[in-house]
Amino acid sequence: MEDVNQRVSELERMVNRLSGDLAENFFQTLQILSSIVGFTERFYDGSHAKYVSEKSAELARILGLGREDVFQIKVAALLHDIGKVGFYDSALYKYPNEMRPNEFAQYALHPEIGRQILKNHHGFDNISDIIYQHHEKIDGSGFPNGLKGNQIHPGAAIISVVNYYHNAVYKTKRERDEQSENKITNTQSYLNNTKEKFSSAMSFLQQKKGILFDRKVVEAFMAIAEMDRKKVSGKVVQRLPVNLIKPGMMFVENYYTSFGLLIASRGESVTKEMLGALVRFAENGEIPHKILVLVEADDVK
């Protein structure tokens, strides 16, 4: 009996080591893939992938999905456009209704390309299925398979809404380095500059809920988007040393390393996990020692 217990303990330790190795490999792969996705984001004000990932996860939690589902949706949202890597610029900055037939034909391939890239990597099988469906619409008018209603994965239905919103409000026909005139100087200028696009996007979601998009998902997301704008209105822009940056603050500019990797994107919320990395990048001269963030007006000294 003692030998059996010892063998069970050895097997448990081996499984734990294997699980740890698999988890480490998964996150290393995810880090590499998310960096690759950055090459598709030249025509966005801020990081499209990071925004869609953050808000899709928030939305999934609000809708009551379990922890594992939320995690898979967050990863799928981060990588949902990986199939666009290598696409012509016209497939990156144009909206689908602006594309020529040959441009749209290429664009429509990206969910399948994304699935093919990911499906054979350990831990990405369900994630690749969500990515494959993120352009499906509940009335069957989406692609690649014209799925309807409950045929669509809940995660894909969530990403579809957030993806539409961020494209509608933050996509631009100019590359990031040409967008200096859009830099946030104060919260009111940001709200004014995005007011028209925000109102148009919210109106479209309201009109198309229950038709193109899941009704519950749209209603929950619209509440999030409205609240986010209210939060911004109570903040001010301040340049702070990286060691004074706190979770919950919001980046006002995009920050890149010397080799072009996006470290923090405009509009992205600071998380606790970012703090150490920001300090290290600043110490190594990859980002400024002081960065622009939105802070609560009451916290300004």
Predicted regions and their residues:
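Boundary/linker elements of alpha-helical solenoid repeat scaffolds
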Residues: 14-17
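Acidic, low-complexity intrinsically disordered segments
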Residues: 1-3
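Metal-dependent catalytic cores of enzymes that make or break cyclic nucleotides
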Residues: 6, 10, 20, 27-247, ...
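Charged substrate- and nucleic-acid-binding regions of tRNA-handling and nucleotidyl-transfer enzymes
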Residues: 249-299
